C-alpha cells in the first residue's frame, strides 16, 4: 500500500495573507503534505508584467512544491512569463506551452517528486489556450500552445511508469477536466482551478479524485490518499484560511 497527503489551493489572485501563508506552512508540516497550487496565484493580468509578485514570496514561506501556470501567470512573450514566477523556490508547470526555440527557463512541463512518506509523485500542469493557433497574436509570440489532450497524453506517458501517483495541476476548468479524466484514467488526482466555485468541491469521478477550492485564498483542501493494488481511497477536509 502507498499513500500521499496533498494540500491544495487555486485562484488566489494575490489574496494570500502572511497569516495564511504561515498557516499553510504549519498544516503542510503537521500532515507531511505536498503543497500544490493550480494557477492564477498572482495579481498581474495576462497582458501585464509587474516588477514583482508579492504572493510568490509568501508561497515560498508556505513551502509549496509546485504550481501550474494559469491565465494570470501567462504572457505572450517568454521573457514576461518567466519573469512573473522567477522568484519561486518551487516548481512551475505547464505541459502544453512550448517555446518556438530554446527552453522555458525554470518552467517545466512535468516533474517527479518524493513525498514525505516516501511515495513517488508525478506532477504536470495544464494551462488554458490563451492564443488561438494561426492567429495574428501567435505570430508575435515566441511560444506555442499544444492541444491540451496531446500535452496530457505526453505527460501521462512520461510519468505513469515511474511513479506511484500521477497528479494533474489543471487550470482548464471543470468542464475540460471532466473530459481529461475520461480520456486519461491513469491520472489519479486532478487538482483544478479556473472555475471559481462558490463552494469548495471535492468528488470522485470514474475513479479519479477532483478538487476545486474556493478562490481568493479563502480555503485550502487537505487530501490523504491511499492505494492498494488498483483501489484508491481518500479522506479530505476543507480548511478555512486566515
Language model features: what each stretch is:
Residues 1-242:
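Acidic, metal/ion-coordinating pockets
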Amino acid at each position: 500500500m502507498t499513500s500521499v497527503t496533498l494540500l491544495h489551493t487555486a485562484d488566489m489572485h494575490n489574496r494570500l495573507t502572511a497569516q495564511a501563508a504561515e498557516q499553510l506552512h504549519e498544516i503542510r508540516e503537521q500532515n507531511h503534505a505536498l503543497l500544490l497550487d493550480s494557477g492564477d496565484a498572482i495579481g498581474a493580468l495576462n497582458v501585464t508584467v509587474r516588477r514583482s509578485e508579492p504572493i510568490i514570496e509568501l508561497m515560498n514561506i508556505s513551502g509549496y512544491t509546485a504550481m501550474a501556470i494559469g491565465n494570470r501567470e501567462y504572457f505572450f512573450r517568454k521573457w514576461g512569463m518567466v519573469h512573473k514566477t522567477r522568484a519561486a523556490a518551487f516548481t512551475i508547470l505547464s505541459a502544453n506551452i512550448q517555446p518556438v526555440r530554446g527552453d522555458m527557463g525554470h518552467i517545466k512541463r512535468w516533474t517527479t517528486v518524493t513525498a514525505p512518506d516516501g511515495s513517488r509523485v508525478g506532477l504536470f500542469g495544464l494551462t488554458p489556450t490563451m492564443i488561438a493557433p494561426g492567429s495574428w497574436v501567435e505570430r508575435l509570440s515566441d511560444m506555442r500552445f499544444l492541444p491540451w489532450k496531446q500535452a496530457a497524453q505526453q505527460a501521462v506517458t512520461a510519468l505513469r511508469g515511474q511513479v506511484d501517483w500521477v497528479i494533474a495541476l489543471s487550470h482548464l476548468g471543470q468542464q475540460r477536466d471532466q473530459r481529461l479524466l475520461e480520456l486519461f484514467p491513469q491520472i489519479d488526482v486532478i487538482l483544478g482551478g479556473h472555475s471559481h466555485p462558490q463552494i469548495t468541491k471535492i468528488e470522485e469521478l470514474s475513479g479519479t479524485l477532483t478538487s476545486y477550492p474556493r478562490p481568493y485564498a479563502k480555503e485550502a483542501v487537505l487530501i490523504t490518499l491511499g492505494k492498494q493494488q488498483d483501489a484508491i481511497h481518500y479522506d479530505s477536509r476543507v480548511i478555512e484560511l486566515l
